[in-house]
Design a protein with these regions (language model features):
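Conserved C-terminal "lid"/linker of ANL adenylate-forming enzymes
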Residues: 116, 150-152, 165-213
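AMP-binding/adenylate-forming catalytic core of the ANL superfamily
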Residues: 97-174
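Gly/Ser/Thr-rich phosphate-binding loop
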Residues: 3-58
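AMP-binding/adenylate-forming core of the ANL superfamily
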Residues: 71-93, 97-99, 105, 154
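Generic structural signal for well-ordered beta-strand positions
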Residues: 81, 107-109, 188, 194
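Beta-strand->loop->alpha-helix junctions that form or flank phosphate-binding loops
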Residues: 38-45, 64-65, 136-141, 180
Length: 213
């Protein structure tokens, strides 16, 4: 930020951030701002956001709080269902795995597409990544497990030390079966993790290492 931008920000009472998840580093910076900062949750179909999460101050929370006119529920797969009649005529079925709390607030755990089914245990990649930042969790096909949890890391040569650390902090069924070092984590044009490319890259690397598996 240049000085002019900082001064302009100080004069702002409320700042709303949308368009994607807010990472931990940004949240840390935001926490020091005098401005009230909120993260929004919404979809293209809802035209605008339908819930807010306070990122700083005494009211900071990991939970999103929906607007009064919005009703939320979960599908059988724990994906979020949105009923927002003021902005959308139809009930919306999302691909976001969520948890709804008794006070009506909710947390987004990750995308349905990013659930790894490893030996019958369903593992949310985004939840593991919160514990393992800056590493990325993906999966590769596995004859016994169906999908094997795989950790991708960039420019980290000591995989043995990392493996030992993972053994300490993760339950057995969450521990990555493979730890792969790559030059850089594939990203989309808007800077998000390219999940599809990560899966392809991990599979190709393992086929190179173990061509007969």
């Amino acid at each position: 930020q240049v000085p002019e931008e900082k001064e302009r920000l100080k004069q702002t009472d409320i700042l709303i951030i949308g368009g994607g998840a807010v990472d931990e580093a940004l949240e840390t910076e935001i926490n020091h701002l005098p401005t009230a900062v909120y993260s929004t949750y919404g979809m293209t179909e809802t035209l605008s956001h339908i819930a807010l999460r306070r990122l700083n101050g005494a009211s900071a929370s990991e939970h999103y709080y929906p607007f009064p006119s919005v009703k939320l529920s979960l599908s059988a797969e724990n994906t979020l269902i949105i009923d927002a009649p003021l902005v959308c005529d139809e009930t919306l079925q999302t691909n976001d795995i969520a948890r709804i709390y008794p006070d009506g607030s909710f947390m987004i755990l990750g995308r349905k597409d990013n659930v790894i089914n490893s030996g019958g245990i369903k593992i949310q990649a985004e939840e593991m990544e919160k514990l393992l930042r800056p590493f990325v969790i993906t999966s590769v096909p596995d004859q016994r497990l169906g999908q094997a949890v795989t950790l991708l890391l960039a420019d980290q040569p000591d995989t043995e030390e990392i493996g030992n650390k993972l053994h300490e902090i993760l339950e057995p069924y969450y521990r990555p079966k493979h730890i792969l070092t790559i030059e850089s984590i594939p990203q989309t044009e808007n800077g998000k993790i390219n999940r599809a490319e990560c899966r392809i890259l991990a599979k190709q690397m393992l086929m190179t290492f173990y061509p007969h598996t």
